[in-house]
């Protein structure tokens, strides 16, 4: 049994040569990411259409529940002064969940490409740094690298840079491991199905051995964890780390 896992396909390259970055390539990750954003935007428009103060619909009740949970999550972990973070955290969670689960319809998950999580982590890192500078001032931020003693400066710098790296790799590693495990399971079940059905004598056995019967049903059960549970859990963990890092940055001052 061979397992071949390739990266995102490059569909076409734009005739644009950007400084440092080089040619602009349109990959499968970019296209699916746009599909994810369109789906989320469409869902938000549908949920918030024709809102009422009384006799609300089930659709509006769901929308209000989602907003209420987002408010509780951010304010409960960061405090009232970070209310402005609610739209960002909600958008980050929704994008991560839909990106993780979109593989269920046959599309390649954008989160199985490290560049996706890396981009999210860089944005979060910039917000963390901005909060530290806002709290302590630029001089205080730089001085923090020399604490508790100046000799610790290189280690503090590495620790600071490790934050976005660890956030990106944690999310990416868990999603990629699910892809690899699912691929191994599909391959193993196909081999087992061929071996078992091949025991049937005659033409019937020859025909049935070419059909991966065991691939039907069993992977669907396993996807409840690897796709649904793990996908939602990783999105929650990434958002939790985001709010905790930013909240801690405000307290350091």
Which residues does each predicted region cover?
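Selective transmembrane helix interface/packing segments
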Residues: 1-253
